[in-house]
Amino acid sequence: FPPHKGKFDKKFIELVIIVDHSXXTYK
């Protein structure tokens, strides 16, 4: 993947983790 794609994926994963920890509203 291009570097910017990797950064996006990392930030997206971090966001999912944060939302998941806030009572799973993402799911």
Curated annotation (Swiss-Prot):
Its cofactor is Zn(2+). One of its GO terms (molecular function) is peptidase activator activity. Disulfide bonds: none annotated. The keyword Zinc applies. GO terms for cellular component: extracellular region. Residues 12-27 form the Peptidase M12B domain. This is Zinc metalloproteinase multactivase catalytic subunit. It is found in: Secreted. Its EC number is 3.4.24.-. Its main location: secreted. This carinactivase-like calcium-dependent prothrombin (F2) activator activates prothrombin via recognition of the calcium ion bound conformation of its gamma-carboxyglutamic acid (GLA) domain, and the subsequent conversion of prothrombin to active thrombin is catalyzed by the catalytic subunit. Expressed by the venom gland. Ca(2+) binds at E14. The lineage of its organism: Eukaryota, Metazoa, Chordata, Craniata, Vertebrata. It comes from Echis multisquamatus. One of its GO terms (biological process) is proteolysis. Binds 1 zinc ion per subunit. It comes from the Eukaryota. Keywords: Blood coagulation cascade activating toxin, Calcium, Disulfide bond, Hemostasis impairing toxin, Hydrolase, Metal-binding, Metalloprotease, Protease, Prothrombin activator, Secreted, Toxin, Zinc. Heterodimer of a metalloproteinase subunit and a regulatory subunit comprising two homologous disulfide-linked lectins (AC P81798). Coiled coil: none annotated. Belongs to the venom metalloproteinase (M12B) family. P-III subfamily. P-IIId sub-subfamily.
